Amino acid sequence: MSKKLGNNSKKIAFVHPDLGIGGAERLVVDAAVGLQELENEVTIYTSHCDKKHCFEEVSSNLLDVEVYGDFFPTNVLKRFHILFAIIRQFYLVLALIFTGKIKQYDYFIVDQLSFCIPLLCCFSRPECKILFYCHFPDQLLALKGGFLKRFYRMPFDLIEEWTTGISDQIVVNSKFTKGIFHKTFKGLKNIEPGVIYPCVDLNSATDTEEDKLMDEEVNEFFKGGKFFLSVNRFERKKNIGLAIQSFAKFKAQLPKNVSEDNRIKPRLVVAGGFDPRVLENVEYLQELNGLSESLNLKCFTIRGKLLIIPPATDILFLPSIKSSLKKSLIKNAELLLYTPSFEHFGIVPVESMLFKTPVLSANNGGPLESIVHFTSDNIATATGYSQEPNDELWSKTMHTFYTELDEATKLKLGENGLTRVHELFSRHQMSEAFMQNLIQSNSKDEEKGILYGILKMWRIELLFVLISYYLVRLYK
């Protein structure tokens, strides 16, 4: 639970839409814990949090979490998601206004949805600063549609740009996202967002008893055989087919006495998030099975405990694996194949480097900032490969890594990865970056435009107070 630990501590509140177990939620939890470790008092406000489906730091009450507005629906007939997300966030902030909690904080950190920022600016203390963490512009994450969908989205996109721009400080998760920010929000060209990279838990590099047991299970299952690894959700945008096609061409380059000997041939393991209720997950796994068979690769799927694998298997699918198995697979893999293109950041390559496994990724998006491409003259710092997402190039890189690199070089790449994670992607580094950006927040009211000035007029404030009072009393 959050506690005030010193005279120099600040009161910091996060405003987040849905505190589940996604990547954005992992960042919020890590940032909150990190800022708490820096002797600040931290609270997370959210519209939804299921204590049975959240991160341990939340379920254990290490962090203070308060929920407002969970009774609102998230959609109607699977439509109007953005509208209801705004309504839920709007209600949350109105609750903070009515209860007076909004006046308690030195800083607010808002992420994903920026629509509440004007209210926070108007009703928080004059010296309070608002930081917005832009994982990616929401309008680019929305599913594309026809004219009516574009017409429906237009006001939300305009409001997103305006509300984002009136925050006191804006940060993004990578330099790549920073470039997308400038291309998307053309009206904010004078704003230069900071960059705060997501982090990984350095403590997870230390094996627990469960990890040791899982390592034994994995080693017994593969019986010393080598394997390449892909870890992604089973979604088409993750381009997992690239790993399968590259593996097929890599296998074709091996001598037949290796590629056809079931005792020593390398395999490809495709693991990741899978929900049988999500149609795309189910369809995509079927498509990947079909692709494997079309390339004359024998595939096998295991759900649950690793018990037995047919000796002839080339590709092993492991949908919906638990964290300890994911960790063990990464540690024991020859090379991690990270197939998505134009990822905003991409935490999986960083996790792989934490466990000293080199990475092969597409040469675009966020992974260009985490992976140091290996060339003949940078063995002191290289952590893997960044290549065009082309199966010919990838298969050649896999072949070079598998057949030409000695163990000392592979170990050095792994050690370099761990060093880079400690230098750039630790929770301490991230929380320090958040604190510095909060301290440097310096936007002034006169820089926020005429509309913001009108919003701050006392009549508008009174109207919002009355609305908040009515809604809170109505649904309390």
Curated annotation (Swiss-Prot):
Kindly list every residue the record annotates as glycosylated.
Answer: N7, N257
Q: How does it sit in the membrane?
A: Multi-pass membrane protein
What is its pathway? Answer: Protein modification; protein glycosylation
* Annotated catalysed reactions: a beta-D-Man-(1->4)-beta-D-GlcNAc-(1->4)-alpha-D-GlcNAc-diphospho-di-trans,poly-cis-dolichol + GDP-alpha-D-mannose = an alpha-D-Man-(1->3)-beta-D-Man-(1->4)-beta-D-GlcNAc-(1->4)-alpha-D-GlcNAc-diphospho-di-trans,poly-cis-dolichol + GDP + H(+); an alpha-D-Man-(1->3)-beta-D-Man-(1->4)-beta-D-GlcNAc-(1->4)-alpha-D-GlcNAc-diphospho-di-trans,poly-cis-dolichol + GDP-alpha-D-mannose = an alpha-D-Man-(1->3)-[alpha-D-Man-(1->6)]-beta-D-Man-(1->4)-beta-D-GlcNAc-(1->4)-alpha-D-GlcNAc-diphospho-di-trans,poly-cis-dolichol + GDP + H(+)
Broad class of the protein's primary localization: endoplasmic reticulum
The protein's GO terms of the molecular function aspect are:
GDP-Man:Man1GlcNAc2-PP-Dol alpha-1,3-mannosyltransferase activity; GDP-Man:Man2GlcNAc2-PP-dolichol alpha-1,6-mannosyltransferase activity
Superkingdom: Eukaryota
Q: Which Pfam families match?
A: Glyco_transf_4, Glycos_transf_1
InterPro entries, alphabetized: ALG2, Glyco_trans_1, Glyco_trans_4-like_N
Where is this gene product found? Endoplasmic reticulum membrane
EC number(s) given by UniProt: 2.4.1.132, 2.4.1.257
Q: Which UniProt keywords apply?
A: Endoplasmic reticulum, Glycoprotein, Glycosyltransferase, Membrane, Transferase, Transmembrane, Transmembrane helix
List residues traversing the bilayer: 80-100, 449-469
GO BP annotations, alphabetical order: dolichol-linked oligosaccharide biosynthetic process
One GO cellular component term noted in the UniProt record for this chain:
endoplasmic reticulum membrane
Summarizing the function annotation, the protein's role is: Mannosylates Man(2)GlcNAc(2)-dolichol diphosphate and Man(1)GlcNAc(2)-dolichol diphosphate to form Man(3)GlcNAc(2)-dolichol diphosphate.
Similarity field: Belongs to the glycosyltransferase group 1 family.
> What's the name of the protein?
Alpha-1,3/1,6-mannosyltransferase ALG2
Its source organism is Debaryomyces hansenii (strain ATCC 36239 / CBS 767 / BCRC 21394 / JCM 1990 / NBRC 0083 / IGC 2968) (Yeast)
Lineage at the top is:
Eukaryota, Fungi, Dikarya, Ascomycota, Saccharomycotina
